[in-house]
Curated annotation (Swiss-Prot):
Keyword Repeat: no
MF-aspect GO terms: flavin adenine dinucleotide binding
Binding site for NAD(+): 273-287
Keywords in alphabetical order: Cytoplasm, FAD, Flavoprotein, NAD, tRNA processing
PANTHER family for the chain: GLUCOSE INHIBITED DIVISION PROTEIN A, PROTEIN MTO1 HOMOLOG, MITOCHONDRIAL
Name listed for the protein in its UniProt record: tRNA uridine 5-carboxymethylaminomethyl modification enzyme MnmG
């Protein structure tokens, strides 16, 4: 039977990608259905209880700048906040928050249930309705047909999910949840390239059985940070510490002597695991010369004793897991509440996607999250927001949108995926972005909120706060530029004493702020009243001190913009372009790049080949002009 309502967008899956996709679509005024196998697991943190980190917090801030939920939920559920790379420059600084799983999930659900234009329905999706290479809707587990203009798949690890603990395995989407088998089989019938990946999680420990006195305490930063541009410290629950301990020679001996019982090393697991979040058995095997590895003991929440031992993800048998845990200092008497496990799942080659995250072969079908080969809540949320936005734009008859590599880490993420593909779970790092001085986490709103407002993603409250902040930055820059300090005055003497050399002539405060010897707060302390908003002061200082570097990056971006944005026709025949090698013809034909810039980033496509493409496009354009004039 048919569902009572027809929707413009259906989102399948209620994880981090699915919630952001559904919220984005609904915020844009589009009638949206979020289909989940279990309403109680909406926004669930399936792995580590943390949001942010190097490269990842940049994505979280960008999601927030575009009106998304992840950062706001983190502020409501965050039980510890820290800045990583705090001694390095602003481009690579990152915010990381430990989150209470229950509070985070509750915050996400509250946002979902109060979002206009969004309906939630508990049913697994078993089939897609596809007609003439266009998606028309979905079929649920109980046979309901629900029609829609666009469908966003955010299936996480559920497609053909297989859980491994030692040599035993069973079907599952994650521990305690069933897999999606029927949908996985249906997707394999489509002309899309499919593979298998693997991820894992450590055993959870009862904190009452742990001796923290022999571990190193790791408190949060003070003053306490916030994740959202609209967040406040008052939203945070109680703050707690994490703890650090280490594996040792005994731990490594236990693992090495049991590798034959590991599904990874016995050939049972075929999927490739995440390079930057390896299992403990992988660490011991790959880094055999290391005497120990750090283990971060992270609280799962304020109302539970469960701990997450970050650093010992494993799929070894339970008896070996128990030996490993109890060999670690402070956990000699530890009780395991939940065993660790590995999970294999289907993913689809992201090179079969457009920049909008719509599949190239099925119109209106969008993929986001782990189905595209990524790992991490933040990467999933960023893709979900983009896919949901573009599904809504399609329903509205508007052009799709994706930020460029020089505009957002979201743009870097998508460009990497659809141009290069991935054979292992993809994780974001600041090192992946060539314009990271411009793409800082602190200026995500200045980069994206105006575009979010144009798309319909940003509400009135966020827009008003953003406009106030932007105006305050401009006013403070103007004030500093128009305020002068002269030699021999009280302010001039104070500045001279700070620098250790006398001022030789008058300077405005903006000139003085460019000097490395002084920061904004010191300058204001010496010269009088400044800006009360620390976020405004931070922007003024960074823009002033790094102005030369930022200008050079902007000039480089402008030079490359013309070729970057040159569109390649969808029907272009690369085999007919004289001078292109068969290898390059094949690579271009497989990837089907959308722009000249994307083509230039395909491995093996040379600058000479790009020149040939430019010549071909000019000839093609001239030829069509002649046809039209005739």
């Amino acid at each position: 039977m048919d569902f009572p309502s027809r929707f413009e967008v259906i989102v399948i899956g209620g994880g981090h990608a699915g919630t952001e996709a559904a919220l984005a679509s609904a915020r844009m005024g589009v009638k949206t259905l979020l289909l989940t196998h279990n309403v109680e697991t909406l926004g669930q943190m399936s792995c580590n209880p943390a949001i942010g980190g190097i490269g990842k917090s940049h994505l979280v801030k960008e999601i927030d700048a575009l009106g998304g939920a992840m950062a706001m939920a983190t502020d409501k559920g965050g039980i510890q906040f820290r800045v990583l790379n705090s001694r390095k420059g602003p481009a690579v600084r990152a915010t990381r928050a430990q989150a209470d799983r229950v509070l985070y999930k509750a915050a996400i659900r509250e946002i979902l249930e109060n979002q206009p234009n969004l309906w939630i329905f508990q049913q697994a999706c078993d089939d897609l309705i596809v007609e003439q290479d266009q998606v028309r809707g979905v079929v649920t587990q109980m046979g309901l047909r629900i029609l829609a203009d666009s469908v966003v798949l955010t299936t996480g690890t559920f497609l053909g999910g297989l859980i491994h603990i030692g040599m035993q395995n069973y079907s599952g989407g994650r521990a305690g949840d069933p897999p999606s088998i029927a949908l996985a089989q249906r997707l394999r019938e489509l002309p899309l390239r499919v593979g298998r990946l693997k991820t894992g999680t450590p055993p959870r420990i009862d904190g009452r059985s742990v001796d923290f006195s022999v571990m190193t305490e790791q408190p949060g930063d003070t003053p306490i940070l916030v994740m959202s541009f609209l967040g406040s410290k008052e939203q945070h629950p109680a703050q707690v510490s994490c703890w650090i301990t280490h594996t040792n020679a005994r731990t490594h001996e236990i693992i090495a002597s049991n590798l034959d019982r590991s599904p990874m090393y016995s050939g049972v697991i075929e999927g490739i695991g995440p390079r930057y979040c390896p299992s403990i058995e992988d660490k011991i095997h790959r880094f055999a010369d290391k005497e120990s590895h750090q283990v971060f003991i992270e609280p799962e929440g304020l109302t539970t004793h469960e701990l997450y031992p970050n650093g010992i993800s494993t799929s070894l048998p339970f008896d070996v897991q128990l030996q490993i845990v109890r060999s670690i200092r402070g956990m000699e008497n530890a009780h395991i509440v939940r065993p660790g496990y590995a999970i294999e799942y289907d993913y689809f080659d992201p090179r079969d996607l457009k920049y909008s995250l719509e599949t190239k072969v099925i119109g209106g079908l969008f993929f986001a999250g782990q189905i595209n080969g990524t790992t991490g809540y933040e990467e999933a949320g960023a893709q979900g927001l983009l896919a949901g936005t573009n599904a809504a734009l399609r329903a509205q008859g508007r052009d799709s949108w994706c930020p460029r590599r020089d505009e957002a880490y979201i743009g870097v993420l998508v460009d990497d995926l659809i141009t290069l593909g991935t054979q292992e779970p993809y994780r974001m790092f600041t090192s992946r972005a060539e314009y990271r001085l411009i793409l800082r986490e602190d200026n995500a709103d200045l980069r994206l909120t105006e575009k979010g407002r144009e798309l319909g993603l940003v509400d009135d409250a966020r827009w008003a706060a953003f406009c106030t902040k932007r105006e305050s930055i401009e006013l403070e820059e103007q004030r500093l530029k128009s305020t002068w300090v002269r030699p021999g005055t009280q302010q001039g003497d104070a500045i001279s004493a700070h620098f250790g050399t006398p001022l030789t002539h008058e300077y405005n405060l903006l000139n003085l702020l460019t000097r490395p010897e002084i920061d904004y707060n010191s300058l204001i302390a010496l010269t009088g009243q400044g800006c009360a908003d620390p976020l405004v002061a931070e922007q003024v200082e960074i823009k002033t001190k790094y102005a030369g570097y930022i200008d050079r990056q902007q000039e480089e971006i402008a030079r490359l913009r013309a070729s970057e944005d040159t569109r390649l026709p969808e029907d272009i025949d690369y085999t007919g372009i004289s001078g292109l090698s068969k290898e390059i013809q094949s690579k271009l034909g497989i990837t089907r790049p959308e722009t000249l810039g994307q083509a230039s980033r395909i491995p093996g496509v040379t600058p000479a080949a790009i020149s040939l493409l430019m010549i071909h496009l000019k000839k093609r354009g001239a030829g069509r002009q002649l046809e039209q004039s005739a």
